[in-house]
């Protein structure tokens, strides 16, 4: 009798995680036009950001000032000059508060905007569902469409985006 609850738990977990992954946006999808609150408390409409530069990199991370998220943010900080030369604006998003995002940005001198999304409006708009935290993903957007998706990468995020851009002519 005991194997049944375990089998049920595994089956339900598999459905949960596969449906969460299936909901995530893919290359070719229209990028969500949604607003969030920046680390300064200002409102930021991603649709406006998409129009300002040829590319926008919207990257998601689970929690500010944790090891993997710090590596990811610092890699993008360190690659920001090269990415900016390629016309890439960067926006980071997590479910953290405005104060947590502000402290994270200041501590690591991030030159890009961080969005505080505790109500998960932006996170959900990008199809990220699951345990209440953002999944570590990045979406490169051009002309309102997702042209590249980087999943789960931390310290190589900037390099991966630059490699993709090098293939775009």
Protein language model regions, located:
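Thiol-/selenol-based redox modules, centered on thioredoxin-like
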Residues: 134-169
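Aromatic-flanked redox-active Cys/Sec active sites in thiol-based oxidoreductases
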Residues: 59-65, 95
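Structural microenvironment flanking redox-active thiols in thiol-disulfide oxidoreductases
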Residues: 70-108, 122
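A short beta-strand-turn-helix
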Residues: 34-55
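N-proximal helix/coil linker or "cap" segments that precede and/or mark the start of modular domains
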Residues: 3-33
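Short, internal strand/loop/helix patches
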Residues: 91, 105-136
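Hydrophobic beta-strand anchors of alpha/beta hydrolase catalytic cores
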Residues: 57-58, 90
């Amino acid at each position: 009798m005991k194997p049944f609850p375990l089998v049920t738990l595994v089956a339900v977990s598999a459905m949960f995680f596969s449906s969460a992954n299936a909901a995530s946006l893919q290359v070719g999808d229209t990028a969500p036009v949604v607003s969030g609150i920046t680390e300064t408390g200002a409102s930021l409409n991603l649709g406006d950001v998409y129009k300002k530069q040829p590319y926008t990199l919207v990257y998601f991370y689970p929690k500010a000032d944790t090891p993997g998220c710090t590596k990811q943010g610092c890699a993008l900080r360190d690659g920001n000059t090269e990415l900016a030369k390629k016309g890439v604006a960067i926006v980071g998003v997590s479910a953290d508060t405005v104060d947590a995002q502000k402290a994270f940005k200041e501590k690591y001198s991030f030159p890009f905007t961080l969005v505080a999304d505790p109500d998960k409006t932006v996170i959900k708009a990008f199809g990220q569902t699951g345990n209440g935290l953002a999944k570590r993903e990045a979406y490169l957007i051009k002309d309102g469409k997702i042209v590249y998706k980087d999943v789960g990468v931390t310290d190589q995020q900037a390099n991966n985006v630059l490699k993709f851009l090098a293939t775009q002519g």
